[in-house]
Regions:
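Auxiliary tRNA-acceptor-end handling modules of aminoacyl-tRNA synthetases
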Residues: 1-185
């Protein structure tokens, strides 16, 4: 167990996050950075292959939802169109997590997050997006790979006063060869 902005727990081979209700609806950044890599043809350690996502958490009786926040259009809450604008601009759910437990004082919920952070979702992938110009000009395409879930997973976790880190090992098959990236999420 490590404590910080949220409390993180490791039980056997599962990783849990204890989210206080006080952080629900607070906007946060979700980002992944390459920490180590077995083939640096397209990307090197230290680089972020994808832009960070602005996220927020919400909870209901049986699940916690992770929403992506879209700030591309905003409306002043004092404007007469604000209620209609808000109904047509809800934050989409990126992932939902069943509530595994509730803290003894009912101030937080516990969810299993290891399988999410070590998944082959775009924000966590070590590969750059394919360039539409590469094909047009006959340039080399970006590396892509087939995810090997059974060989991938969380390596470690850390909690700090203002953020948390999960270190993951992401294993792929690229051009019939093994490829491994360690990511810090």
């Amino acid at each position: 167990t490590v404590r910080g902005l949220v409390t993180l727990h490791k039980v056997k081979s599962k990783y849990y996050m204890e989210l206080p209700y006080s952080v629900m609806d607070a906007q946060m950044l979700l980002a992944a950075r390459v920490s180590g890599i077995s083939n640096n043809r397209d990307i090197i350690a230290g680089r972020m292959p994808h832009d960070p996502l602005l996220i927020r958490w919400s909870a209901d009786d049986d699940k916690v939802s992770l929403h992506t926040v879209d700030c591309s259009a905003v409306c002043d809450s004092a404007e007469s169109i604000a209620p209609g604008f808000e109904r047509n601009k809800i934050d989409p759910v990126m992932q939902a997590f069943p509530i595994a437990a509730v803290s003894p004082d009912s101030s937080a919920v516990v969810i299993e997050v290891g399988s999410f952070f070590a998944s082959d979702q775009k924000p966590f992938r070590p590969f750059l997006d394919a360039s539409p110009l590469a094909k047009l000009f006959g340039l080399r395409e970006s590396m892509q790979g087939k995810f090997q879930k059974e060989m991938s997973g969380v390596v470690s976790m850390q909690a700090f006063p203002e953020n948390v880190n999960f270190r993951t090992r992401m294993v792929y098959t690229v051009y019939d060869h093994p490829f491994t990236a360690e990511m810090t999420v």
